[in-house]
A protein has these predicted regions:
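Transmembrane signal-anchor helices characteristic of membrane glycosylation enzymes that use polyprenol
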Residues: 1-18, 26-29, 36, 132-134, ...
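Membrane-embedded alpha-helical segments of multi-pass membrane proteins
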Residues: 19-20, 62-66, 92-104, 147-155, ...
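Membrane-interface alpha helices of multi-pass inner-membrane proteins
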Residues: 28, 125, 172-188, 194-195
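Short hydrophobic/aromatic helix or loop-helix immediately within or flanking a transmembrane segment
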Residues: 29, 45-85, 147
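Short, hydrophobic secondary-structure boundary micro-motifs
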Residues: 39-42, 136-139, 194
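Hydrophobic transmembrane alpha-helices
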Residues: 72, 76, 106-114, 132, ...
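Transmembrane-helix signature of polytopic, membrane-embedded enzymes
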Residues: 80-91, 104-132, 151, 165-175
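Short acidic/glycine- and proline-prone juxtamembrane loop motifs at membrane-interface regions
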Residues: 140-148
Length: 196
């Protein structure tokens, strides 16, 4: 269990390696810092960067960046206050976003199963999620989409359970639409969620 708290990978100044990691981080950074999708004014391109018309153009979908952007915004605020930090707070707090979404994924699954009167075990849910490989992506490859995708599916599940059990459904229909939008923007292969 203690291996999950390995923190040395968070001690980087900027995420610029590994194509997918760089792409998802690029989306989060540009959304949080200046609210546009112009990547040229935030990032130093790496050898794996993709370009369109001479401009940085990340290939990954923007959904995980949209979910992680508030964390980068908070980290950027800390960076502007504590300017002498060796490790940027935006990286540290960004790396925690996947852990927080993993916890909320477990919580939404737990809450949904409680609403269905199934007596879930929260520890078992946490162990199932981390044992499925999500732990690796939450702790080690925190900018990848896997945890954000699990969160969006758990949010869809929770929304459907609430819609089926509540008389006042309007807010949960909105939550379902939002969670479907997030699921599709995190990874387009989630279109199968629309079919069900």
């Amino acid at each position: 269990f203690s291996i999950l708290f390995k923190l040395d990978y968070r001690y980087i100044n900027e995420l610029s390696c590994c194509g997918d990691d760089f792409d998802y981080y690029s989306h989060a950074l540009t959304i949080a810092v200046d609210n546009d999708f112009d990547y040229s004014n935030q990032l130093n391109p790496s050898k794996s960067t993709f370009y369109v018309d001479g401009k940085v153009a990340p290939l990954g979908f923007y959904g995980s960046g949209l979910l992680a952007a508030p964390f980068i915004l908070v980290g950027s605020l800390f960076d502007s206050i504590f300017v002498d930090s060796y490790i940027p707070y935006k990286i540290i707090i960004y790396s925690l976003s996947s852990l927080i979404y993993l916890f909320f994924t477990a919580y939404l699954i737990f809450k949904s199963l409680l609403l269905l009167n199934l007596k879930p075990n929260f520890t078992f849910i946490i162990l199932s999620l981390t044992g499925s490989g999500l732990g690796f992506y939450a702790f080690e490859r925190y900018s990848m989409t896997h945890v954000y995708e699990a969160f969006s599916v758990a949010l869809i599940f929770y929304s459907v359970v609430k819609i089926s059990l509540n008389k006042e459904k309007r807010i949960f229909y909105f939550l379902l639409a939002f969670s479907l939008f997030i699921a599709l923007s995190v990874r387009y292969t989630n279109y199968h969620l629309l079919i069900a």
